[in-house]
Amino acid sequence: GLVERIGSKDAEIHYKSNHTKIDEVLDIPNHTVGLEKVVNFLLDEKVGVIKSTSEIEAVGHRVVHGGSTFSNTTVINQVVKDKIKKLFSLAPQHNPPNYEGIVVAESFFPNAKQIAVFDTAFHQTIPVEAYKYAIPTKFLVENNIRLYGFHGTSHKYVSEQAIAHLGIENSKIITIHLGNGCSMTAVKNGKSIDHTLGFGPVTGLIMGTRSGDIDHAIIFHLVNNLGYSLDEVNNMLQKESGMFGLTGYSDLRDIESEAEKGNKECQLALQMNAYRIKKYIGSYA
């Protein structure tokens, strides 16, 4: 199942079990209410799959940012929660709700193990020559700035499946995660050695609403010469750029459909997207 748009009066909950599928739009103001709805479905006499919450042995939590602290899937305790809180500044839009989800799950499933899976963990094997930025080292060290990478769970799974399917011992694989967020990873013998996303989730490939690589001089031009605030530029690069900025559509299915109808902007956007992907494949090969 899935709960979307938490914090909205038009939140959505999707539940599926056996031959039952339920989709509802309702007011879900916070994670507590959202998980309560999920638990109610799980326990429901007609569509539920458990009789008691004590049947749940473990709850998995996707945590976007583990910094340099977490390099593996981790059983959550108070020490782990405290460390996740210290990483809020590295992912202010993601780690706080991830943390809230952990706290709420602990209240509903007090006897279950809570497990954290970090998006950044798989990329902790990237060597220093690939993760370090060429800005003053003192600044990097004092502020924990480096390439962290994201979508690690996806890249780890895909690379493991590819290695198993191909049956090779010494492997060099390029994995590509394509969706609204996009990234590419160079994987050598099962370990991440380079990745297109960096300190944040904006660099690299062209994404649904994120810009991918741009010349950072553009940011200074927007702020210093055109009067944009840093918040406005950040919002532009995160939510108004990428395929959406080029075409007005963020979904590739819509863009492909429009391109087939002769929409020149959509055709060019697809060419740009393919070129960027090929460019990184070439650099990782």
Regions found by a protein language model. Give the residues of each.
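Beta-strand segments within the central parallel beta-sheet cores of soluble alpha/beta enzyme folds
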Residues: L2, K172-I176, D231-E240
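Adenine-nucleotide phosphate-binding core of ATP-dependent small-molecule kinases
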Residues: N235, K239-G248, L252-A285
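General beta-strand structural signal in soluble alpha/beta enzymes
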Residues: H61, P92-P96, K113-F118, I174-I176, ...
